[in-house]
């Protein structure tokens, strides 16, 4: 449902602007179908990753990623692009574990990226696509806000995460956003997913097996409420990360430091929550999340 408002406008926009959005649209639909099958019947992890990799390669090839650069540099850009698209698609999916969190973050990043790319002198295509992604996510949030009545599932989170990753990468490749800005805007998701993956790897746990060990899940269980966590992340987005993203884009020489200021406190917070709060509600007396 979260994707339906996007498809027609995106197709029309691609025809109007001359930008070929067909690979992105088809890849998004394929990933939505794969996610639906995984929701209904379960699919092997390897199959899901192969499909995601093929979709990422097709979309990346349509971006003309490495024009007039040396082959070695081109290969590195391709590898990093594939890693970003496939990796972030799964990060977004991992972070869709409590009511409202993924949809609100998608709305924030969509609108913020659209605004920042317009400030950088972008044409109409990418800002409008980003704004559409933000508006679609905000609309879905009306039903997904805690207590949620509708849920993304893999059928929604995989394609939405992929689309946002692809649009963000396109902005970076066009020079509209810096990599630092992208890291700042997605800092809550990247920090939580990265720390959780590292801790599970160090512990010898199966990193591809479903779990509820993310910091945001631990905190929601400890508080007994999804709404408090979702509102807290939104407050961090608007009061902390958005000003840092504006600084990074307005003063490029300050961008690395702005990213550091954004990431380090969040990384520290995620580590503390992950080490001090139990997963799955173990030894927590407040009960299950109710809102």
Residue ranges and their predicted role:
Residues 56, 79-81, 134, 183, ...:
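Hydrophobic alpha-helical membrane segments, chiefly transmembrane helices and signal peptide h-regions
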Residues 242-260:
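Extracellular/periplasmic helix-loop-helix junctions in multi-pass membrane proteins
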Residues 44-47, 153, 187, 224-232, ...:
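Membrane-interface starts of transmembrane alpha-helices
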Residues 29, 195-227, 289:
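Cytosolic, membrane-interface loops and tails of multi-pass inner-membrane proteins
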Residues 1-193:
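"…together with the soluble PPM/PP2C metallo-phosphatase catalytic core" -> "…together
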Residues 213, 223-239, 243, 248:
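Alpha-helical transmembrane segments of integral membrane proteins
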Residues 176-180, 197, 208-210, 228-231, ...:
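Extended hydrophobic-aromatic, low-complexity segments
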Residues 269-286:
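Membrane-interface capping segments at transmembrane-helix boundaries
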